[in-house]
Amino acid sequence: MNKFIIFSLSIISFNISADLKQNLDKDIDILMEKVIEWRHDIHEHPELGNREFRTSKKIEDHLRSLGIKVETNIAYTGVVGMLEGDLPGPTMALRADMDALPVEEKTGLPFASKVRTTYLGNDVGVMHACGHDAHVAILMGVAEFLAKNKSSIKGKVMFIFQPAEEGPPEGEGGGAEMMLAEGIFDRYNPEVIFGLHVTNIPNGVLSVKPGPAMAAASAYRIKIKGVQTHGSTPWSGIDPIMATAELIESLNTIVSRRINIINNPAVVSVGLVKAGTRNNIIPEDAQIMGTIRTFDPLLRKQIYEEIEQIAKGVALGTGTKISVEFDVGGFYPVTYNEPKLVNAMKGSLMKASPGRFYESNIPVTGAEDFSYFSQEIPGMYFWLGINKPGVGLESANFGERTDVAGNHSPYFYVDDSALDEGVRAFVYLIDDYPGKF
């Protein structure tokens, strides 16, 4: 989620309710103090997917205090709030994800996470290394402002606080797919949904990619079974670690040597390797897990087949037994931004961050289960830059990497000053949408 090629500043006419804009301009400083305080608190107390108990309770209490109707315990810890405006209009959904990552924070911030937990059998730190704390705080701020200004709202606003975007614990369902399966769209019937994601592009920049915006994602797992033996006599066993090394080397040739990615980008990465308990024991078992990112279902099928062929070849050559699983923990479809919706609504992003709106022409190989929502109804998912002010602005190409760590890094940093644009973007989208699409 770090690489962008963005272009074409457009000039579009737009209107926002005069009262709503004046009230937002008047209230924004006090509101942002609250948003920042909420973010720092959530950042300091991160929770993994389907375990966002403290976070969801904080959200529930806040929404209820605003007089917003609340439904809780959706897909384990999800929260939905419904605000009815005083004017007739459509039901519009805004979404924020709540979960953190098994990452030990190294930012040195005064509100840095010190939380630890057990994940996949390992003691790990927990960190909001993907900025979901910012997403929650922004949407809490939007809910507060809109609730206080519901006399200017045309229609209903559905606030979706979603658990487990990063994936649920193994053996559990979760995330957007589970919220839909539990009927949130059937009950509340939104006709459009908007979401945002913070990332390390220049401060306050808002960027959107029409059409396929983010990749489909599948996790794979490869289990390797050998014959355990003493490390001093490897010939008396079958070494799964040697087979694992061959697998990793071969997996990295799929994209670089076996696939034409000129028109269809793809990624195959290895992210987890487990084997062994002692230095002098060749173990019986080893395991590899990784991720596959594609934009084309036929290409994804080809990659699955390539991985299976590689596994068969390595098993034959090493004497190990190898099994392959795909879609471990679920599958995320391509995140698709309805082009007509983007064209109709990008003016809202332009006025939320004047002079810093960019329309991208290159999709991102990150993945998002917001894609499940936008498969059901038209959706628009956009990016908010959270670098420190000035970082990256010296570059003519806003897509270049900066010296700010990217999402999922233990050094990932959200500059609080950028959250203002996120609040404004959501407010303007809600105000502008009725009658525009």
Predicted ranges, named:
Residues L20-M127, A137-G155:
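Acidic/His- and Gly-rich active-site-bordering loop/insert found
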Residues I42, G81, L94, H132, ...:
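Divalent metal-coordination and catalytic microenvironments
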